[in-house]
């Protein structure tokens, strides 16, 4: 049994397929390109090392990311990524996600932000049919979810579900990449699986013990509906107790109870019920402001020759596709005008620059002509 399940991870076929999944967006790196160009040979070599116990991961590289917020990120060697991807995709992910409730929406096949937004709309419409605009929402956010995640809690989450031989491989990777007793980097696929798994027991508690129908979680952001403030306060107390036992805490400013009719901010949109039961989505104004600043900066880079117009167009198109998920027709029209005006400003600047240069040349020409005429008169 152990050998069969290990073969699903470290067999040549598994590693070779994993290599093809890992190549996306990284073949510009010399190390990744070299591994991929000699894929069969490298996969066989990696298989041999893993089966003989001579495999040793290379030290991860740490770097800083500044957007959307400043944090430390970790990059691992391509060969190590191939092995870990095989382990995650072939065994860890399918086992860990088996017990998930449907409303656990992050980092899973067939789910994601779009599905999460749609589920919230369904909950709101269902609530309106039963209660109209009356009722409240408890919205929760865990303070520093990944930076404060206990290594003991994460490892225990994996240990409870994974076969011993797979858990041993998982534990070794976690301990080699992350020092100390607390804190993970969310860039790793294994850590993302930990992120959606650690709170799985809480999801079941909320649904089955607290009898909450309208409950949804996207990683460490979650919300639920209730008829009264008191009802939701009781649920909040139970959730806080559960989280504190696992060394987490709710963010005091981002966790609150408020009327449903105020609208629910979730994943970059505000979902608001109208008096007729229709749900409208309004994109976060901060997102619009950031996009305008980003576009202006990128147009400036095009002007300096550091970026292509095509790249800027693609970025703006992607943002419009995101905005279109809400009720944003008028906003998109305004942004189209703003974007067009940015290029007009650039063209006007170039025109003014050319006009100024031309005027200077004319002035210099007149000066030279007057000087020549004066010299001729003097000669006479």
Where on the chain are the PLM-derived regions?
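Right-hand nucleic-acid polymerase module
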Residues: 76-77, 85, 176-180, 185, ...
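Active-site-proximal segment of RNA-dependent polymerases
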Residues: 2-5, 88-147
């Amino acid at each position: 049994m152990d050998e069969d399940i290990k073969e699903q991870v470290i067999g040549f076929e598994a590693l070779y397929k994993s290599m093809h999944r890992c190549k996306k967006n990284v073949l510009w790196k010399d190390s990744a390109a070299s591994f991929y160009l000699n894929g069969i040979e490298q996969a066989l070599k990696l298989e041999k090392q893993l089966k003989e116990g001579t495999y040793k991961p290379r030290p991860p590289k740490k770097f800083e990311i500044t957007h959307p917020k400043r944090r430390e990120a970790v990059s691992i060697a391509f060969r190590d990524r191939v092995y870990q991807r095989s382990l995650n995709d072939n065994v860890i992910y399918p086992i860990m996600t088996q017990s998930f409730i449907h409303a656990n929406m992050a980092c899973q096949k067939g789910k994601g932000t779009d599905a999460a937004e749609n589920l919230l709309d369904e909950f709101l419409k269902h609530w309106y049919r039963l209660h109209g605009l009356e009722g409240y929402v408890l919205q929760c956010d865990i303070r520093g979810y990944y930076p404060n995640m206990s290594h003991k809690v994460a490892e225990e989450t994996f240990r409870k579900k994974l076969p011993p031989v797979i858990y041993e491989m998982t534990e070794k990777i976690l301990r080699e990449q992350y020092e100390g007793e607390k804190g993970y980097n969310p860039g790793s696929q294994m850590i993302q699986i930990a992120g959606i798994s650690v709170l799985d027991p809480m999801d079941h508690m909320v649904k089955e013990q607290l009898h909450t129908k309208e409950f949804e979680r996207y990683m460490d952001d979650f919300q639920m509906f209730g008829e009264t403030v008191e009802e939701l306060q009781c649920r909040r107390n139970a959730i806080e107790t559960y989280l504190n036992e696992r060394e987490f805490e709710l963010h005091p400013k981002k966790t609150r109870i408020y009327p449903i009719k105020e609208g629910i901010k979730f994943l970059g949109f505000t979902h608001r019920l109208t008096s007729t039961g229709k749900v409208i989505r309004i994109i976060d104004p901060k997102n619009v402001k950031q996009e305008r600043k980003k576009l202006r900066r990128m147009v400036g880079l095009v002007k300096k020759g550091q970026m292509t117009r095509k790249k800027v167009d693609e970025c703006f198109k992607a943002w419009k596709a995101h905005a279109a998920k809400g009720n944003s027709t008028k906003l998109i029209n305004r942004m189209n005008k703003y974007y067009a005006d940015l290029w007009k400003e650039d063209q006007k600047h170039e025109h003014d620059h050319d006009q100024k240069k031309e005027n200077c040349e004319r002035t210099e020409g007149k000066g030279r002509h007057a000087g020549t005429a004066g010299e001729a008169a003097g000669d006479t």
